[in-house]
Amino acid sequence: MDSVLIHVLIDGLVACVAQLIRIADELLQFILQVQEVPYVEENGRAEETEADAPLPEEPSLPDLPDLSDLDSILTPREDEDLIFDIDQAMLDMDNLYEDTVSGINDDLTGD
């Protein structure tokens, strides 16, 4: 029964991470929209202004809620130092799960 509980907890954790990714995507889209149209308040009215320095062109971001194209999401860009290795993350999760289940089984058989 405990292994089922751990499985449910891991599923919940994965669902939370997926929700955080969706929230981060929405925030990023909002920030990008705000940066595209900066406003300056003068004399009680808003005037559209151009950005002081043009932003370097970056490739468009993939749609994170549509996780069908994980390779493009997880492929590092030229200027990124951090590489997220999905295979290694899955192996680490599997090892963690096995260690946890083994520990629980040892505790149950030891009693």
Curated annotation (Swiss-Prot):
Region (Disordered) location: 43-72
Top-level lineage group: Eukaryota
Extent of Low complexity compositional bias: 61-72
Listed name of the protein: Putative uncharacterized protein TRPC5OS
The organism's taxonomic lineage, starting at the top: Eukaryota, Metazoa, Chordata, Craniata, Vertebrata
